[in-house]
């Protein structure tokens, strides 16, 4: 539908195609499958349909040349910059192919900023939106030395050039928007905050009441952990706390991950679930069966999975870092702990485990918050309006 907007704006969405970014690509595919709100969308994922030459380039650029062990400085081989440049070069290749085929676009949408690393000249001739969840602050805050900090300099400078060239920055959080202003005070690009769109699970309206009824009948509370990078997401902190506090005597823990964990060494009461695809029946079943969501992450910019917990009506245990407190509201929709603080994590688990009423109340508030802040229909309308504005419509 074009409506009163005249000719639609042709927008090209360039997606990095990794991890949670594919979830956003699925949203775009569904929300903009037809011309809607004056916008006609073409989307490309830079990791799809790689040519042999692109595979060779990815191997060369993303090959680690410096050990990334638990101790000592990291990234002295500029690995992060090389990987982000790879995403940018792949994106530029796809744009070039489309333009050679005669396609023209009124707006480019880069999701996230590394996909624009090789397209600064293009951004100067085609109005562009850059979608971010963080600046390089998310890695700088974990730097172990001055030398490591300096190794991220190329990323910091490239991000800055991209932010300045963009017509609009769309940030998932207030935290990331503030980081742009603080890290690049000379950047005059408008920035708006739009939390990631998250759909409510199908037929999930009664899940909270179901859980409370299970608890009334004496069912064992179930905790759910969902995370790909198990160590970075605090998975081993959770397992340590689980074993030391003997939570298996009064709760159960489901772990949804593809990280190579040896199931044979897991503590009692823990069930490992592998190979489950997002938004499938099996995925929804685990969210429905859970009573508490727990992700004591040590490294997170935003955390879409916390939004998914709220959408499922679950109280969440998260960490006090970056944008997480914008989603998990301490003592309202969940409990926040300091990253790596196992004593706080144990207390948070026990607090929620022991109180079905608290779980119900926090889960209800969490679902209400996600309905209001992450509604996919509203996100589509707001994003379409932003695209039209950038295009001058």
Descriptions of predicted regions:
Residues 330-331, 335-342, 351-357:
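Conserved acidic donor-binding segment of nucleotide-sugar-dependent glycosyltransferases
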Residues 205-233, 239-244, 253-254:
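Conserved donor-binding/catalytic core segment of Leloir-type glycosyltransferases
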Residues 351, 358-373, 379-382:
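A short, well-ordered alpha-helix in the C-terminal region of glycosyltransferases
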Residues 257-285:
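Nucleotide-activated donor-binding/catalytic signature segment of Leloir-type glycosyltransferases, i.e.
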């Amino acid at each position: 539908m074009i409506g009163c907007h005249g000719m639609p704006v042709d927008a090209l969405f360039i997606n990095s195609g990794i991890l949670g970014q594919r979830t956003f690509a699925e949203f775009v595919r569904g929300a903009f499958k037809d011309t809607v709100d004056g916008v006609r969308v073409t989307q490309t994922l830079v990791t799809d349909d790689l040519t042999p030459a692109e595979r060779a380039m990815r191997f060369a650029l993303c090959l680690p040349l410096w050990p990334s062990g638990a101790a000592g400085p990291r990234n002295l081989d500029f690995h992060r910059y090389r990987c982000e440049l790879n995403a940018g070069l792949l994106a530029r290749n796809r744009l070039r192919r489309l333009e050679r085929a005669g396609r023209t676009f009124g707006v480019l949408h880069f999701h996230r900023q590394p996909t624009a690393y090789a397209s600064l000249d293009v951004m100067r001739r085609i109005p562009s939106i850059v979608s971010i969840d963080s600046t390089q602050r998310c890695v700088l805050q974990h730097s172990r030395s001055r030398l490591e900090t300096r190794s991220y300099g190329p990323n910091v400078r490239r991000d800055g050039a991209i932010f300045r060239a963009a017509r609009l920055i769309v940030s998932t959080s207030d935290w990331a928007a503030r980081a742009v202003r603080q890290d690049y005070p000379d950047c005059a690009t408008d920035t708006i905050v739009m939390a990631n769109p998250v759909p409510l699970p199908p037929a999930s309206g009664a899940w909270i009441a179901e859980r409370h009824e299970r608890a009334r009948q004496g069912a064992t509370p179930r905790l759910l952990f969902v995370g790909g990078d198990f160590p970075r997401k605090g998975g081993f902190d959770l397992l340590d706390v689980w074993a030391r506090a003997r939570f298996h005597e009064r709760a159960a823990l489901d772990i949804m991950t593809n990280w190579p964990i040896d199931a044979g060494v897991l503590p009692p009461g823990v069930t490992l679930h592998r190979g489950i695809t997002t938004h499938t029946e099996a995925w929804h079943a685990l969210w429905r069966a859970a009573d508490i969501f727990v992700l004591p992450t040590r490294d997170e910019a935003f955390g879409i999975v916390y939004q998914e917990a709220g959408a499922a009506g679950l109280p969440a245990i998260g960490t006090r870092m970056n944008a997480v407190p914008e989603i998990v509201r301490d003592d309202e929709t969940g409990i926040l702990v300091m990253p790596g603080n196992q004593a706080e994590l144990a207390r948070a688990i026990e607090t929620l485990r022991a109180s079905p009423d608290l779980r119900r109340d926090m889960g209800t508030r969490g679902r209400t918050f996600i309905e209001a802040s992450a509604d996919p229909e509203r996100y589509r309308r707001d994003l379409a309006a932003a695209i039209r504005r950038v295009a001058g419509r």
